[in-house]
Amino acid sequence: MALTTERVKLFFEWFLFFGAIFIAITILYILLVLLFEVPRYIKELVRCLVEYLTRRRVWMQRTQLTEATGDVEIGRGIVEDRRDQEPAVIPHVSQVIPSQPNRRDDQGRRGNAGPMF
């Protein structure tokens, strides 16, 4: 009877030991996930906050301008998005490469073995 009690005690000691190791590994894993994932969420949150504040500032400027002038059309001239503030790239004529369509007489010189219709 005493031998069985010792075995049960030993079993529970080992069970608690491995359980404690499992819990410690789980806690370390959670801490590592928090260490690497929370900065991403904070970065995304800051980006959304800045975008919201920028849109709100533009909206307030537009509203104040409309109230000051009484003209609704003036408020539409304010740029709503930063992407609109970038200068447009317009290619010069020298940068444009004209496309040359393939003529029928060119097809024979290209070594094309297909039928010519």
UniProtKB/Swiss-Prot annotation:
Superkingdom of this protein's organism: Viruses
Membrane topology annotation: Single-pass membrane protein
UniProt keyword Transmembrane helix, yes or no: yes
InterPro entries: MP
Role this protein plays: Transports viral genome to neighboring plant cells directly through plasmosdesmata, without any budding. The movement protein allows efficient cell to cell propagation, by bypassing the host cell wall barrier. Begomovirus genome is shuttled out of nucleus by Nuclear shuttle protein (NSP) and the movement protein transports the DNA-NSP complex to cell plasmodesmata and facilitates further movement across the cell wall.
Annotated stretches, region: Disordered: 83-117
GO process terms (BP): symbiont-mediated cell-to-cell migration in host; symbiont-mediated suppression of host innate immune response; transport of virus in host, cell to cell
Parts of the chain that traverse the membrane: 15-35
Keywords: Host cell membrane, Host membrane, Host-virus interaction, Inhibition of host innate immune response by virus, Membrane, Suppressor of RNA silencing, Transmembrane, Transmembrane helix, Transport, Viral immunoevasion, Viral movement protein
GO cellular component, one term: membrane
Naturally occurring in which organism (per UniProt): Banana bunchy top virus (isolate Autralia) (BBTV)
Protein name: Movement and RNA silencing protein
Pfam families associated with the record: Babuvirus_MP
Sections of the chain in a coiled coil: none
Annotated compartments: Host cell membrane
